[in-house]
Amino acid sequence: MMKLENKLHRVLCSLHQNSISTHKTYVAVAAQDEYVRMGKVSLPRMYAVKPRIQKNFQDNYRFYGTLLCICWLYFFIWYPFALLALMVGVFLSFVMHGLGSLTINQNIRLDPKYSIPGVCAVTLIVIMFLAPVGRLFWSFCIVSSFAGLHCLLTTYENPAGIL
């Protein structure tokens, strides 16, 4: 009896135009003009898209990692000193994380919560000086846009109906 009830509920919810189906959950949302009136146009769709994006990243993480490595290799073959600066920055971040909180004087305290982002920022600034900014951001744009589009366009339960 419960299976029949679930199937009927699923069919009725899928026929309703204001419902969004996630993996096994059906979420009823207000009509679009209600959200426009409230100023929340994109809210009802984001929590429905999130499980799908997460599943696509989990399924295709090798693909995204390979794409990222290819773009970085392309970038660092042409600008090896930028790779050296990145390696030094990553090494310094690991050292700062390994040392933890350091107190040099009573007034000077190095907390990893603040020092590691500082090391990362200095590393990125050095990389930008060693390599043309256009090339660096071209690699970032290729990876992020391709991975994001692939993750959104992959056909796995399109619950939000945005594509």
UniProtKB/Swiss-Prot annotation:
Has a role in meiosis. GO terms for cellular component: Golgi apparatus; membrane. Its main location: membrane. GO terms for molecular function: small GTPase binding. It is a multi-pass membrane protein. It is found in: Membrane. This is Meiotically up-regulated gene 109 protein. Signal peptide: none annotated. The chain crosses the membrane at residues 61-78, 82-104, 114-134, 136-156. Keywords: Meiosis, Membrane, Transmembrane, Transmembrane helix. It comes from Schizosaccharomyces pombe (strain 972 / ATCC 24843). The keyword Transport does not apply. One of its GO terms (biological process) is meiotic cell cycle.
